[in-house]
Amino acid sequence: MEPEPAAQKQPRPRRRSRRVSMLSEEPAAGLPADTPGPAANERCSLRRGSSFTFLTPGPHWDFTLKRKRREKDDDAVSLSSLDLKEPSNKRVRPLARVTSLANLISPVRNGAVRRFGQTIQSFTLRGDHRSPASAQKSFSRSTVPTPTKRRSSALWSEMLDINMKESLTTREIKRQEAIYELSRGEQDLIEDLKLARKAYHDPMLKLSIMSEEELTHIFGDLDAYIPLHEDLLARIGEATKPDGTVEQIGHILVNWLPGLNAYRGYCSNQLAAKALLDQKKQDPRVQDFLQRCLESPFSRKLDLWSFLDIPRSRLVKYPLLLKEILRHTPKDHRDVQLLEEAILIIQGVLSDINLKKGESECQYYINKLEYLDEKQKDPRIEASKVLLCHGELKNKSGHKLYIFLFQDILVLTRPVTRNERHLYQVYRQPIPVQELVLEDLQDGDVRMGGSFRGAFGNSDKAKNIFRVRFQDPSPGHSHTLQANDVFHKQQWFNCIRAAIAPFQRAASPLELQGLPDLHEECEENNPSAGNLRAQRRSCVVPGVMQIDEESALDCGSSVQTVEDTRNMKAQRPQPGLRRARDKAQSGGKKKETLV
């Protein structure tokens, strides 16, 4: 009896479970791929489903099989998952966390994915120290550079007709170039003065960023100088021929240059104006406004102070421009004598402006001095009209001091702040220049912190140091000062030496007899401090003292001690400087260079 067909198809449910477990990868063996049946329908329904919770793993569950992908997906990397845009209320992870994405792609056999991971790591390492917000902000700024407004730099010869150019000599072309440079500079100056008023002064006044009084103090009378330079430009224009040449300009300059004395008040106020502007820059509104102007094309990447300082920089160029015109002017030309006169006029104007500016600067710093003791007040400070030099130095303890050298007195101060106002607190007793002694010290003679050489073994030794002190140590202390570098030390040395020189020349001829020239070595005459103190002050020539050790090549290698000073005071006064020098050479203690 033949079995029934239904009995032969009983194992099919087991085959169906295997097909389901294999996620319909391959058709059943022995059956065509398009064979319809209930198993095929169930397989299609499972493929369309989104959940695998209905599948129960069986003994034939195979984890080694992979889902087949299309070939075009092998090299495709979706960038949508790397969207950097996040909600505003969501915490943004640092950019360094993106490295985990690159590390997850391992092992990497595909070249495109490997290159992508390297790219992620490369820009992650470059941006580890910044947040994504700051990175995007800096990128947005750099992608839109502000175009800078540039001025024409064409030469006069470039605008000249070819036939006209051939008819002029090389010297005459250079002379016309110099005259054109003078005229072009006046035009640029007028534009800058108008720009300072239109782009800075008026908007800040209208927006109430600064008060009218503050703006007047900073800008001064810039509007009053515009007609002055327009007048020179008009005169040069009238003297210009149709072919573009100027035959004579000397008489124009002789008549016009004295009007530059109007800048005395403006230049004298520059120091106070700069200080007020720096103070107002602490205001966020002022800072934001100036920054926006700086990023605008009209500013040419120049800040406000650059525009305010343009008149001063223009003044110092006039002698150079006039000398350049004179250099290319023939000796038999009528302009030669007039140009020489014009050069003398502008030099006199600049001297007057510098003198007025120096007095104003001197008074500005005098008003900022703060005294801790009434004994520190010296009438020579208030009477000072010239500030020879000033700047920051360090004392032997490493503290920063601000030094002022007036024409008659040296003042050491410490910068302080009182009610948001910068002042200079007078430190110790000021030293009059006529009683000032300057000592040059070699590098390593003094250790910063107050210890002398050798006191603390192999420690850092001070460099670029010198000492200032009283001739008579009783009124005050000596000060060991340190400059930032050799250049600044030499500047201070030259400045103090220049201040001392007039008092050396004021000595009597008898006392100066036998004195060597500058930079030569001699011994200071030191009478006793008891009965002949007045004679000592009249005989001692204040100056630069270089202390030597048995050799003139090792100037400044030793330090004057208290014991040496007492021994010198104990000596009897000699009638002449020659005998004092002979005695010092016989003793072999030290040598001093006095200026």
From Swiss-Prot:
Ranges of compositional bias, category Polar residues:
133-146
Q: The DH domain covers which part of the protein?
A: 174-356
Primary location class? cytoplasm
Q: What is this protein called?
A: Neuroepithelial cell-transforming gene 1 protein
Describe the effect of residue 492 to L.
Inhibits transformation by N-terminal truncated form
**PH domain mapped to chain residues:** 386-501
Which SUPFAM superfamilies would you find in this protein's record?
Answer: DBL homology domain (DH-domain), PH domain-like
Residues recorded with modification N-acetylmethionine? 1
Mutating residue 321 to E: effect?
Answer: Inhibits transformation by N-terminal truncated form
Record-linked Pfam families: RhoGEF, SOS1_NGEF_PH
What more the UniProt record tells us is:
Can be converted to an oncogenic protein by N-terminal deletion that leads to nuclear export and cytoplasmic localization. Transformation seems to require the activity of multiple signaling pathways. The physiological conditions for cytoplasmic relocalization are not known yet.
Name the SMART domains on file: PH, RhoGEF
Q: Which GO terms describe its biological process?
A: cellular response to hydrogen peroxide; cellular response to ionizing radiation; intracellular signal transduction; myoblast migration; positive regulation of apoptotic process; positive regulation of GTPase activity; positive regulation of substrate adhesion-dependent cell spreading
Residue(s) carrying Phosphoserine = 21, 100, 106, 122, 508
Keywords noted in UniProt: Acetylation, Cytoplasm, Guanine-nucleotide releasing factor, Nucleus, Phosphoprotein, Proto-oncogene
About its domains, the entry says:
The PH domain is sufficient for the nuclear export of the oncogenic N-terminal truncated form.
A single Gene Ontology CC term: cytoplasm
Residue ranges, annotated region (Disordered):
1-42, 127-151, 555-595
Compartments reported by the entry: Cytoplasm; Nucleus
A GO molecular-function annotation: small GTPase binding
Highest taxon in the source lineage: Eukaryota
Where the record places motif Nuclear localization signal is: 12-19, 66-72
Function description: Acts as a guanine nucleotide exchange factor (GEF) for RhoA GTPase. May be involved in activation of the SAPK/JNK pathway. Stimulates genotoxic stress-induced RHOB activity in breast cancer cells leading to their cell death.
Q: How does it assemble?
A: Interacts with RHOA in its GTP- and GDP-bound states, and with CDC42 in its GTP-bound state. Interacts with the PDZ 1 domain of BAIAP1.
